[in-house]
């Protein structure tokens, strides 16, 4: 099994970036490395294929979403097209590339731009008020630098729901993202990935929204309430992970003092998060859903700039999808 796992990891790495010089300076590598783009394809991966009536629930985690990217690329390459995706934060960003059927796109972008301060950095936060540069990441990159297949997203048999946090209600907001080309639903995708403290509030349709992870980190209950019988959940932390209280609550209290319900969710997020992780594990053991998660503690930070760590986490996700593939097929066939 270990040999198979290693082979899958190697394959995942080779498909995304070229080999780097063994003795190159790490900082220089990070600055100059130029990942190869996803394999060019005239058609999205789902073209001419059937979508499977399954809900795919994707946790966030900023750059830890590289694990999810590896899982989803394996799914696309092996013709598993879940027809409903429910994504939180980085999960929503991974989700919209899955919907468009573009294999390798998420990993390619994260690898290529992880050291560009306009993409995701505290430098971007200082200059724009957003750690994730909205103009750069959501406009310049998909519209000019690395064109996104907006038509494929629109035509896809897969639908995406982006999960955000409504500051005034202190509840999760679930929005079907159908139109990115005319920016009709783009604010909801941006809101879902707008981390508190380092992002400006997104105001859309009379709502004030931020990152969905605060109010529903793993939206399994929302998925269950859709009435679906099959649910695949991709997590970005291993089974030993336990979230602790937010050490920045004094700062958050000052910043979001006008939103008491939202503050309560921030204050007790670790309790809800750990409870959800336990619930998901129990449901997986009972065969009520299927979980794919890292097998060891994740060392990638939210704003990771180390390409080697990012690539390794992507390879872990790809390999874990391969390792659990037969079990997943058995679950879906029941």
Where are these regions (language model features)?
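Patatin-like phospholipase
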Residues: 2-88, 96-334
């Amino acid at each position: 099994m270990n040999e198979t796992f290693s082979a899958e990891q190697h394959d995942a790495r080779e498909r995304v970036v070229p080999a780097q010089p063994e003795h190159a300076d790490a900082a220089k590598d990070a600055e100059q490395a130029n990942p190869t783009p996803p394999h060019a394809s005239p058609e999205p991966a789902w073209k001419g294929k059937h979508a499977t009536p399954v809900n795919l629930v994707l946790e966030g985690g900023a750059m830890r979403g590289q694990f999810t990217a590896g899982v989803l690329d394996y799914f696309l390459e092996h013709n598993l097209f879940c027809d409903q995706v429910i994504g939180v934060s980085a999960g929503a960003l991974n989700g919209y590339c899955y919907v468009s059927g573009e294999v390798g796109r998420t990993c390619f972008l994260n690898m290529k731009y992880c050291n560009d301060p306009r993409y995701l950095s505290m430098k971007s936060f200082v200059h724009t008020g957003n750690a994730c540069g909205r103009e750069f990441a959501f406009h310049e990159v998909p519209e000019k630098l690395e064109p996104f297949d907006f038509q494929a997203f629109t035509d896809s048999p897969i639908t995406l729901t982006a999960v955000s946090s409504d500051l005034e209600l202190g509840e999760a907001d679930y929005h079907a993202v159908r139109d990115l080309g005319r920016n009709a639903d783009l604010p909801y995708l941006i809101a879902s990935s707008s981390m508190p403290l380092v992002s400006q509030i997104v105001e859309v349709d009379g709502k004030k929204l931020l990152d969905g992870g605060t109010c529903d980190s793993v939206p399994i209950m929302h998925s269950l309430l859709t009435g679906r019988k099959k649910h695949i959940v991709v997590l970005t932390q291993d089974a030993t992970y336990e979230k602790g209280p937010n050490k920045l609550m004094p700062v958050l209290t000052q910043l979001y003092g006008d939103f008491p319900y939202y503050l309560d969710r921030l204050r007790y997020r670790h309790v809800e998060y750990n409870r959800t992780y336990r619930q998901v594990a129990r449901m997986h053991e009972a065969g009520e859903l299927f979980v794919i998660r890292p097998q060891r503690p994740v060392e990638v930070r939210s704003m990771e700039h180390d390409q080697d760590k990012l690539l390794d986490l992507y390879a872990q996700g790809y390999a874990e999808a391969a390792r659990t593939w037969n079990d997943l097929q058995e679950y879906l066939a029941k």
